[in-house]
Amino acid sequence: TSSAKALGIEKMSERCVQGRAVMVDLHAHLGRERVRVDYDLLMNILHKDQVEVEPGDMVCLHTGFAQMLLEMNKHPDPHAVENSCAVLEGRDERLLQWITDSGLVALIADNYAVEGLPASPRPGSCAALPLHEHCLFKLGVHLGEIWHLTPLANWLRDNGRHRFLLTAPPLRLPGAIGSPATPIATV
């Protein structure tokens, strides 16, 4: 734990995390290729799928990464793990500005860090995880990582939907700054 007092994760567990969520199915467009998704590519996918992100939404990014790990059946291939599935381009200023302007309250993915790890090099920027810095420290936007989104993404796509009710309470860990979540999607 970090001994966080006023902003410990237990504050969220007292009231839960619940609200409207929207699925962005990057995997349906990009497959398992390692692609750094910038603002233009994300907007193109949102437009093609007619997905609208509104203020207060929890945005789920389905990349297929967690499903790929499960398919490795406890024998992960390090090369595949390092070089597969979409990640957000954390150094894209337009993408970071869209996150701010959209009013989203959580950004969730089925990969390790939501953004590319390590981040793309950029002169003048020392943040190892610039999207984390932007979301967590500047905006207070929560990040969810390594969620198994494939069954939900498939159901939503098969039923022509993108929105659902997401309930994702963190564990009650006094003083901690993060926690595993126990998410439930209601469709």
For the regions a protein language model found, what residue spans apply to each?
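Active-/binding-site microenvironments in catalytic and ligand-binding cores
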Residues: 1-187
